[in-house]
């Protein structure tokens, strides 16, 4: 037996061999098949020599899981989790353990993809529909989205919607009440500048004095005051002003709904419905509007349709509004949102039910009443005379109060004008009220919580005016009234999970989506209280662990990208695009070239690119691609020269969206630079760059990084995501700042793009762990293995399907595109048929019809083993044989396993199945693999047209699920 060295024995838990799917023997077998001697040899065959890095990354060695956990545990301990009363949109909450364990920490929920294949996503679609129902019930409006990124960006989306739908077409002013949260105003101003809107800020009642297209109000406001806006809203709407409201979701359990006051749009954060603060995120925003505005809504909307058997089925509705179809004409660039967190919030509402929510909200309000009564009894003056959970105090010795608060390990809100704010939440206890009295008043105040409570009960609370007390019922649907025991809740969550296909069942080979392993060790720290329970606006000296983690992650990303600086703030890839384009815009403005507003975008680009360019106030000019899928250099040269005076930038993806490393990438960069433009390199395909090349080395100026793709943050069924941007030094002064927390950059005065200074900081430990565990060598090997897996799949499938684009040496990058158009022409079988048939084989379909209609784009990632790759290949080969039977006339074009896919249990139990020209076994057990491990779609193919023509986006009768 060969003896191992001690060093080798010490590497027993190295993460690298857990993350990469094929073991060394499988890799060699695959290399032999594709015709390469080694991973380095394959890399040399694929990546153009001119852009290959000539040095290794300088991140450090890979390490074991135990070592990585120990290190990040040390960082977590540097965070001081004080009791937070800061509020401002972020509140303490108690995550029900049944949700924490069965949803937040469950790969069946967090590794799924956006439900573009609804037949295998009915579980989370139902959970999201519940979220929409909660949003509609509490706001009193007609139609809700499936989630937006955060409250502040939802405000910006509300402003954009207001302009789209307002009948005051000549108006260009958006009014913002001066008592909204400052971070919300910050993000709104950033967006308004790009659109050329004027933002007027003033007291709410002054809104009627301006010619507006829209207005924004906070309910309750930043000081805690609750205002009845009914008359004001009526007056504004009579002037064709679109009224938008930022609302607190917990307060709406007790308060009159904004919809009942006449609001057009209501939005806010669902964070306090069972989602930790996470130093700023991720959290789902709710967004609800009147039915008449449905075509102008941003983001995804879940609707009810029917399948081919006539059964109710859920799907994403009205997708023609979205960026992947409408491109620069889309309502929004929203792509990845916050579905996992929306699901948590919806389950929170289901678990507590209307009565439980009312108890929680009433307790918060009662404690606030007690706190206010005690302070007023001692002569303390309050700014507000109505409240739900927040009081604002004036006339205090701020320095003394702050000192006592810090000594008691609590954080209050201290405004610049000397006002001290206190916001209570679900976690507040009696003892906390006593401690607050001690901090605010000092020792010896003599106040007694029980006595104050008895006084309030006897006299009646006046904190919520009678006219603002909610009178209508909420959450009356049976779903919110039958799962209050943990047993029932656990089983309900499991029933929904079992309807969905996620990475814990099989490979998800979606091209341009990088559905790699989200390792358990990477996910563990996210639930730790030291990371989960930090308020984003706490004093930074309490967040030393977070600060160090963000600094280390940023330095690693700088090294990986070849840029000079990184901004962590954008909380999705689309937001990263927007933030990067804003930096370019501000750079041109600083040079006296504000007229540079044209963005060149290849016709193959992802739909978010033109949508983001439009958000940044740019005009899109599309450049052509040649027959090989590369940017047409002659067309680019001509258009760059034509618009040279006004050229702002080009947005290009690398490797291209066609899955190849374009040889001319540096020439493309040079052409744009020669005409005064900047190069935005979309980081969607960064998984094919890490350790081999980099955007900065190639010649780009700015990129966003999808941490939820390349750096292992899970997709969550449609979010969360993170989209930090890397920039060259000349753009660094122009990245996003923040009005509340100064990140310590030159860009402090730049507007924000997200509500929190570091975006969804709560999931940054995932990417930190991913990079720390893999190290320089592991990151490079992951990229090389992704190339190997893609080329292995490509070569295997090329024997059965045409491969549309290949690069040098007949290779692809990390993904390949198979062309199904000849099959459709010969047999009538479509890419949709093949996608749905893959469900019967236990697979999620690859990306359909992007970047070319009638194709499938396959990205296997480095995490899939040869065994799983072969299972997928076998399924595709088997499907090709089925297509051949249709081509030969053995099966009718309108009655075959592909046309009828996917197949359900109901199908094979139906006696009428006997009339089909294929057997039940062919329908549901088409391969040996699924006979022993079968995933069952729960609905047949869904009728999208019916769903959009009969739009219904609320909970359906419970009998439909029984």
UniProtKB/Swiss-Prot annotation:
Catalytic activity, reaction form: N(6)-[(R)-lipoyl]-L-lysyl-[glycine-cleavage complex H protein] + glycine + H(+) = N(6)-[(R)-S(8)-aminomethyldihydrolipoyl]-L-lysyl-[glycine-cleavage complex H protein] + CO2
User: Coiled coil located at which positions?
Assistant: none
Please give the CDD domains that the UniProt record associates with this protein. GDC-P (cd00613)
Q: Which residues carry this modification: N6-(pyridoxal phosphate)lysine?
A: 709
Question: Where does it sit, as one GO cellular component term?
Answer: cytosol
- Keyword terms: Oxidoreductase, Pyridoxal phosphate
* GO BP of this protein: glycine decarboxylation via glycine cleavage system
Please indicate if the UniProt record lists Transport as a keyword.
no
Name listed for the protein in its UniProt record: Glycine dehydrogenase (decarboxylating)
Q: Which organism is it from?
A: Shewanella sp. (strain MR-7)
Q: What's the source species' lineage?
A: Bacteria, Pseudomonadati, Pseudomonadota, Gammaproteobacteria, Alteromonadales
């Amino acid at each position: 037996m060969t003896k191992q060295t001690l060093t080798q024995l010490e590497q027993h838990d190295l993460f690298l061999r857990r993350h990469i799917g094929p073991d060394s023997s499988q890799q060699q077998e695959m290399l032999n098949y594709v015709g390469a001697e080694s991973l380095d040899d394959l890399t040399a065959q694929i990546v153009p020599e001119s852009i290959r890095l000539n040095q290794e990354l300088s991140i450090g060695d890979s390490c074991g899981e135990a070592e990585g956990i120990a290190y990040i545990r040390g960082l977590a301990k540097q965070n001081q989790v004080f009791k937070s009363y800061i509020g401002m949109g972020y509140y303490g909450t108690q995550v029900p353990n049944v949700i924490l364990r069965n949803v937040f920490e469950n790969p069946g929920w967090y590794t799924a993809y956006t439900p573009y294949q609804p037949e295998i996503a009915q579980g989370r679609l139902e959970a999201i529909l519940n979220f929409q129902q909660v949003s509609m019930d509490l706001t009193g409006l007609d139609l809700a989205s499936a989630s937006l990124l955060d409250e502040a960006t939802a405000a910006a989306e509300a402003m954009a919607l207001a302009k789209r739908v307002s009948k005051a077409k000549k108006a260009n002013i958006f009014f913002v009440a001066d008592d909204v949260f400052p971070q919300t105003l910050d993000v709104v101003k950033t967006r308004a500048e790009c659109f050329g809107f004027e933002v007027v800020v003033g007291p709410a009642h002054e809104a009627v004095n301006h010619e507006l297209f829209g207005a924004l109000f906070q309910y309750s406001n930043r000081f805690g005051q609750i205002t009845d806006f009914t008359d004001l809203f009526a007056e504004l709407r009579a002037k064709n002003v679109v009224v938008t409201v930022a609302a607190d979701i917990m307060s709406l359990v007790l308060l009159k709904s904004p919809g009942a006051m006449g609001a057009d749009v209501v939005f806010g954060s669902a964070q306090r419905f069972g989602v930790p603060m996470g130093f700023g995120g991720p959290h789902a925003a709710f967004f609800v509007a009147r039915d008449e505005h449905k075509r102008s809504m941003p983001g995804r909307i879940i609707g009810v349709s029917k399948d081919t058997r006539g059964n109710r089925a859920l799907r994403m509705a009205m997708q023609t509004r979205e960026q992947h179809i409408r491109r620069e004409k889309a309502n929004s660039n929203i792509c990845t949102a916050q579905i996992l967190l929306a699901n948590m919030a919806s389950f929170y509402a289901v678990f507590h039910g209307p009565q439980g929510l009312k108890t929680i909200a009433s307790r918060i309000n009662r404690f606030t009443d007690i706190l206010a009564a005690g302070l007023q009894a001692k002569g303390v003056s309050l700014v507000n005379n109505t409240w739900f959970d927040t009081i604002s105090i004036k006339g205090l010795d701020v320095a003394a109060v702050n000192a006592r608060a810090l000594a008691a390990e609590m954080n209050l809100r201290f405004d610049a004008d000397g006002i001290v704010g206190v916001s209570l939440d679900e976690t507040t206890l009696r003892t906390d009220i006593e401690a607050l009295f001690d901090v605010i008043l000092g020792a010896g105040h003599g106040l007694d919580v029980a006595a104050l409570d008895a006084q309030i009960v006897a006299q009646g609370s006046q904190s919520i005016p009678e006219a603002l007390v909610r009178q209508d019922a909420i959450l009356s649907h049976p779903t919110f009234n039958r799962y209050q025991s943990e047993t029932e809740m656990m089983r309900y969550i499991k029933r929904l999970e079992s309807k969905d296909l996620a990475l814990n069942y099989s490979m998800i080979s979606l091209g341009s989506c990088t559905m790699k392993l989200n390792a358990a060790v990477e996910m563990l720290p996210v639930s730790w209280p030291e990371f989960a329970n930090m308020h984003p606006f706490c004093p930074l000296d309490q967040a030393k662990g977070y600060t160090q983690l963000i600094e280390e992650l940023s330095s690693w990303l700088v090294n990986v990208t070849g840029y000079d600086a990184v901004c962590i703030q954008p909380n999705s890839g689309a937001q990263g695009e927007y933030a990067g384009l804003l930096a370019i815009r501000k750079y041109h403005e600083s040079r006296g070239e504000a007229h540079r507003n044209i963005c060149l975008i290849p016709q193959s680009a992802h739909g978010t690119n033109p949508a983001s360019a439009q958000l940044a106030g740019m005009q899109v000019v599309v450049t052509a691609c040649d027959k090989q899928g590369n940017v047409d250099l002659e067309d680019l040269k001509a258009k760059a020269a034509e618009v040279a005076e006004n050229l702002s930038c080009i947005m290009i993806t690398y490797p291209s969206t066609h899955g190849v490393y374009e040889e001319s990438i540096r020439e493309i960069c040079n052409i744009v630079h020669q005409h005064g433009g900047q190069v935005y390199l979309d980081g969607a395909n960064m998984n094919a760059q890490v350790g081999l090349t980099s955007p900065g080395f190639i010649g780009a100026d700015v990129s966003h990084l999808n941490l939820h793709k390349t750096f292992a943050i899970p997709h969550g069924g449609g979010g969360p995501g993170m989209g930090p941007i890397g920039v060259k030094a000349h753009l660094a002064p122009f990245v996003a700042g923040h009005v509340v927390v100064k990140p310590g950059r030159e860009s402090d005065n730049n507007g924000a793009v997200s509500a929190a200074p570091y975006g969804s900081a709560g999931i940054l430990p995932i990417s930190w762990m991913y990079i720390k565990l893999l190290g320089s060598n592991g990151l490079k090997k992951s990229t090389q293995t992704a190339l190997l897996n893609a080329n292995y799949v490509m070569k295997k499938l090329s024997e059965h399907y045409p491969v549309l684009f290949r690069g040098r040496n007949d290779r692809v990058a990390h993904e390949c595109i198979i062309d199904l158009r000849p099959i459709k022409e010969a047999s009538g079988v479509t890419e949709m048929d093949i996608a749905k048939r893959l469900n019967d084989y236990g697979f999620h379909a690859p990306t359909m019809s992007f970047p070319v209609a009638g194709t499938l784009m396959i990205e296997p990632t480095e995490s899939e083993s040869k065994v799983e790759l072969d299972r997928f290949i076998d399924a595709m080969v088997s499907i090709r044989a089925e297509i051949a039977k249709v081509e030969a006339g053995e099966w009718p074009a309108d009655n075959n396993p592909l046309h009828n896919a996917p197949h359900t249990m109901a199908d094979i139990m139906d006696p009428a199945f006997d009339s089909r020209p294929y057997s039940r076994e062919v329908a549901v057990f088409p391969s040996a693999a699924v006979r022993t491990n079968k995933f069952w779609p729960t609905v047949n193919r869904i009728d999208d047209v019916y769903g959009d023509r009969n739009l219904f986006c609320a909970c359906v009768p419970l009998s439909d699920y029984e």
